[in-house]
Amino acid sequence: TLAEFSLDALIKDLLPASQFMTNVKMKEDTSENVEFAIRLQGDVLVPVDSHFPVEKFKAITDGYDADDKRAVADARAKLATAFKAKAKSVNEKYIVPPKTTDFAIVYAPTESLYKELTEYQDPSTKELLTQELMKKHKVVICGPNTLSAYLQSLHMGFQSLKVQKGATEI
């Protein structure tokens, strides 16, 4: 899918092969594999999965094009529901401390999709979708720019550790 292809390209462009794994089985009692796992110090893994429900996102853009506020609101609610289900699934399948971090990342492959997700507020609770997903399911949504920044900061941290280790050995 577009999401998987985009995530693959981003991770492979920003991290050396030693810092990530692909199609990783997180739990022994399942056949489910997370698309990527970023290796942290101590071989702790950050699960990274992608999600792009194209039809639900297209319904939002169609609503905007038709200047139909009700259609946009309905489509945004359906998109939020799809990401809530994805976050729940990712939590259940891939977050398994101490093998992994106590959170996972779900990658939204376009900035426009990421914008919709970060701006969506539950009409009844007024809670932002991104906050709800983190609180309930320990899932962080990242778009291309935020994931790039996260991966670059991890890579710089790993480089600093290498330099520090080298200096200690001298």
Which residues are covered by each model-predicted region?
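Amphipathic, heptad-repeat alpha-helical coiled-coil/stalk segments that mediate oligomerization
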Residues: T1-I170
